[in-house]
A protein has these predicted regions:
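Catalytic-core regions built around general acid/base machinery
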Residues: 81, 129-132, 236, 240-250
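Membrane-interface soluble catalytic domains
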Residues: 1-54, 126-127, 131, 135-136, ...
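Histidine-centered active-site microenvironments of extracellular/periplasmic hydrolases
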Residues: 253-254, 260-298
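Short amphipathic alpha-helical face segments that pack within enzyme cores
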Residues: 77, 236-239, 315-319
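Active-site-proximal alpha/beta segments of enzymes that process anionic O-linked groups
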Residues: 16-206, 211-220, 313, 333
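Polyampholytic, low-complexity intrinsically disordered segments
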Residues: 214, 232, 242, 357-360
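Active-site rim elements
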Residues: 115-120, 178-181, 225-234, 245-246, ...
Length: 380
């Protein structure tokens, strides 16, 4: 079943053709209007929760290097685990091609989409998903298959996104050697550690950020000099996720699992950008398989709900807010029909940015701006 999302400021549409000078000017004006509009948007969340509301955990699983296009290019787009989710966003834009800004965008997703520069500006706590959930009684948790030290990754989440939890540390089995020679933990072991420790936790409600970089380009098997190809690593991760979901279902624990990749791996590239390069965040890289699964609720419909239209992190934060507002876990089959839960989620026009490149869609065509220069049609 497909359910349309809500509204976003309309982007002009015409048949593709040679870009006109007036279009180039209009693209810049449209981008400025987009940023101004997004700055005022907010996700709606409850002011508080009743003692009668059914507690549940929220698990945000952030996966590096996995786009919709990567799944197709690797013949993994029909992997069985993808159909097990209750909700799938068909055109979710991660809005960047790099890990650091992707996590900042996810964790600041209770507001509209900021520019790349604004993302690193002054903190706005009203935009921080973990902070907003903290006011509702949610305790933070943090797990990774890496240390978070590379490129000051973890510290930026603390400084710019309201992450206060310490990393859960355990002696996990070694799975890969990272591109930077860091030891990377086995992802299934990390998932099982979360489940095991959650079962013994005294916290009534937790929100966990879990970040995996197993699919990052350059990772290799221990003792091997060459990088492990993308497809076997991706299949292994999807298989592990399938196993984890089986075990979580058997536990009966009430959990909202949100899978939201950071960006793609650029498995096959395009005419402009070679495979595995992500300097220009085009739609092949930034449209990622974002999915939601509810555990611990009996009699949910088997049919997967597809959210159509262009969406991004504001829709995800809004969905979490609607789940809380509806006390969705409080009734068998969910307190409201699943299609009502995703109805009218806010849409966001596809605009993506890195520090040196911006990409957007205008008149059914992708445009790119490099290093603050002139907007040009993207010929990929």
């Amino acid at each position: 079943m497909t359910v349309a999302g809500g509204t976003a400021p309309a982007a002009p549409t015409t048949k593709p053709g040679k870009a006109k000078a007036e279009d180039i000017k209009a693209v810049g004006e449209w981008y400025t209007a987009f940023v101004d509009y997004e700055r005022e948007r907010r996700a709606t969340m409850p002011q508080g929760l009743s003692e009668k509301d059914t507690p549940f955990d929220i698990l945000l699983l952030s996966i590096c290097s996995l786009s919709n296009d990567d799944l197709v290019a690797s013949q993994l787009d029909t992997h069985p685990v993808l159909n097990r989710f209750n909700i799938r966003f068909d055109e979710f834009n991660s809005a960047t091609g790099y890990s650091g800004p992707a996590l900042l965008r996810l964790l600041n997703g209770a507001c509209g989409q900021p520019s790349h520069n604004d993302l690193y500006g002054e903190r706005r706590t009203e935009c921080e998903l973990m902070t907003r959930l903290g006011t509702l009684g949610y305790t933070q948790r943090l797990l990774m298959d890496h240390s978070g030290e590379y490129d000051n990754f973890l510290q930026s989440l603390r400084d710019k996104a309201g992450v206060t939890a310490s990393i859960d540390k355990a002696k996990f089995p070694l799975r890969y050697m990272g591109f930077d020679d860091e030891e990377l933990a086995d992802d299934l072991a990390v998932l099982r550690h979360w489940q095991r420790t959650s079962m013994h936790s005294k916290d009534r409600r937790t929100v966990t950020l879990m970040n995996f970089i197993a699919l990052h380009d350059g990772n290799r098997l221990p003792g091997h000099g060459r990088s492990e190809p993308f497809k076997p690593r991706a299949k292994r991760l999807l298989d592990d996720l399938d196993t984890f979901m089986n075990e979580l279902e058997r536990s009966g624990r009430k959990v909202m699992l949100v899978v939201v990749p950071e960006h793609g791996a650029a498995v096959r590239g395009d005419k402009i950008q070679a495979p595995r390069l992500r300097d220009i965040p085009n739609l092949r890289i930034t449209q990622v398989p974002t999915m939601v699964k509810f555990f611990g609720i009996k009699n949910l419909p088997d049919e997967q709900i597809h959210v159509s239209g262009h969406t991004s992190y504001l829709a995800l934060s809004s969905l979490i807010g609607k789940t809380l507002e509806a006390d969705y876990f409080g009734k068998d089959g969910g307190s409201v029909p699943l299609e009502d839960l995703v109805k009218d989620l806010p849409q966001t026009n596809p605009v993506s940015e890195n520090g040196q490149a911006q990409v957007l869609k205008y008149k059914d065509r992708e445009y790119v701006r490099l290093n603050g220069g002139e907007w040009k049609p993207y010929g990929g």
